[in-house]
């Protein structure tokens, strides 16, 4: 089987982290985000994976090629000279995706969930249509494009309603699909939207179905959702692979901690915390609902809450970081500083408080 991951472009919503590496290489749960997807595809029997890239492809190639052997897959990079939207990349990768005439998976690189690829493939083959969208249920469907089903045929999609003012359903497109190769014939080699241009044709032909996703789902393409997705991911690990989570007298709730991290016995970590390789946590530090990326240091008696601490950064003593603060690569926060919702660009030194949301350049 084959799969295409829409890696996309600049990752502006996740800046300042994406000023240093492309978004799919930002570590989520201590692994590059895209590795969660590559591993799930490989586990479902996918042997050919296409990464549709239009930003810094050379970095992606250098980082990901080494994983081919580990996961037993062929990784091809389909490089767009101009952004082609969500459908154009399928046309660009037509040679790989049409190989052996079997269905192929498509997924957005921002999506984190318990990828149900095997079940999705079985469901797709059983209904015999040309395409299947994975759907997830949401509490506030008025914020999204909602899937409405055909009354007579379960799971057959009748139409999409964009941001409905009245309740028509609570299932939305989760950004994971399986499609038959002939769907590529509906796509032109130009910037095209699969959601707005390709799927409506399949709906008209009564060839598009939806598959309900079980478990958690999150688009982690911006800091607030990255942190929310981390909470959901750790909850999922606690159920499926609890041995991966840290335990100890100073651990509260779910925490994923790299074994090379050095943490003071008087620090308190958790709930909902990820700590990367070679991180140092000082005495009396308190960290909740946060991610600390590799080679960073949190000095004594600081509070880190709802924050992403970027690589190689230092947080001084008696600091308080909260409110979805994001430190870029190699940031230094001086002692006794308060940051509330600051987005700090790489290589900055912060010696003044940031009491409200701001971009520090």
From Swiss-Prot:
PTM annotation (Phosphothreonine): residues: 153
Residues joined by cross-link Glycyl lysine isopeptide (Lys-Gly) (interchain with G-Cter in ubiquitin): 244
Protein name: Mannose-1-phosphate guanyltransferase
SUPFAM superfamilies with a match to the protein in the record: Nucleotide-diphospho-sugar transferases
Protein's UniProt keywords contain Plastid: no
PROSITE patterns linked: HEXAPEP_TRANSFERASES
One GO CC annotation: cytoplasm
Domain of life: Eukaryota
Pathway entry: Nucleotide-sugar biosynthesis; GDP-alpha-D-mannose biosynthesis; GDP-alpha-D-mannose from alpha-D-mannose 1-phosphate (GTP route): step 1/1
Functional note: Involved in cell wall synthesis where it is required for glycosylation. Involved in cell cycle progression through cell-size checkpoint.
Family that this chain belongs to: Belongs to the transferase hexapeptide repeat family.
Catalyzed reaction equations: alpha-D-mannose 1-phosphate + GTP + H(+) = GDP-alpha-D-mannose + diphosphate
Extra remark beyond the main annotation: Present with 97100 molecules/cell in log phase SD medium.
Cited InterPro entries: GMPPB_C, GMPPB_N, Hexapep_transf_CS, Mannose-1P_guanyltransferase, NTP_transferase_dom, Nucleotide-diphossugar_trans
Enzyme Commission (EC) number: 2.7.7.13
Localization per record: Cytoplasm
Keywords, ordered alphabetically: Cell cycle, Cytoplasm, GTP-binding, Isopeptide bond, Nucleotide-binding, Phosphoprotein, Transferase, Ubl conjugation
Main location: cytoplasm
UniProt-listed GO biological process terms: cell wall mannoprotein biosynthetic process; GDP-mannose biosynthetic process; protein glycosylation
GO molecular function: GTP binding; mannose-1-phosphate guanylyltransferase (GTP) activity
EC supergroup of this enzyme: transferase
């Amino acid at each position: 089987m084959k799969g295409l991951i829409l890696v996309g472009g600049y990752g502006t919503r996740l800046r300042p982290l994406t000023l240093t590496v492309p978004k799919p290489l930002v570590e989520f749960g201590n692994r590059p985000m895209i590795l969660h997807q590559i591993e799930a595809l490989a586990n479902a029997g996918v042997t050919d994976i296409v990464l549709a890239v239009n930003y810094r492809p050379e970095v992606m190639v250098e980082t990901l090629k080494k994983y081919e052997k580990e996961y037993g897959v062929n990784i091809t990079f389909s490089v767009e000279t101009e952004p082609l939207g969500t459908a154009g990349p399928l046309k660009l990768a037509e040679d790989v995706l049409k190989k052996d005439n079997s269905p192929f998976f498509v997924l957005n690189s921002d999506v984190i969930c318990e990828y149900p690829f095997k079940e999705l493939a079985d469901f797709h083959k059983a209904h015999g249509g040309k395409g299947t969208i994975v759907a997830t249920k949401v509490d506030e469907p008025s914020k999204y494009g909602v899937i409405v089903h055909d009354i007579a045929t379960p799971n057959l999609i009748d139409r999409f309603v964009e941001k409905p003012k009245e309740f028509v359903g609570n299932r939305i497109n989760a950004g994971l699909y399986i499609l038959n190769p002939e769907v590529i014939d509906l796509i032109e080699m130009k910037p095209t939207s699969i959601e707005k241009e390709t799927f409506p044709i399949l709906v008209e032909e009564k060839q598009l179905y939806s598959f309900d996703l079980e478990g958690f789902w999150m688009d982690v393409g911006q800091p607030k959702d990255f942190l929310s997705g981390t909470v959901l991911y750790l909850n999922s690990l606690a159920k499926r692979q609890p041995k991966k989570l840290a335990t100890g007298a100073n651990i509260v709730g779910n925490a994923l901690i790299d074994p090379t991290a050095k943490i003071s016995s008087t620090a308190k970590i958790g709930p909902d915390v990820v700590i990367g390789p070679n991180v140092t946590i000082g005495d009396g530090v308190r960290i909740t609902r946060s991610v600390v990326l590799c080679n960073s240091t949190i000095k004594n008696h600081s509070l880190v809450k709802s924050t992403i601490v970027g690589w190689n950064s230092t947080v001084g003593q008696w600091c308080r970081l909260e409110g979805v603060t994001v430190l870029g690569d190699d940031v230094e926060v001086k002692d006794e500083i308060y940051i509330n919702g600051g987005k700090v660009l790489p290589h900055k030194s912060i010696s003044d408080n940031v009491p409200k949301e701001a971009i520090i350049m």
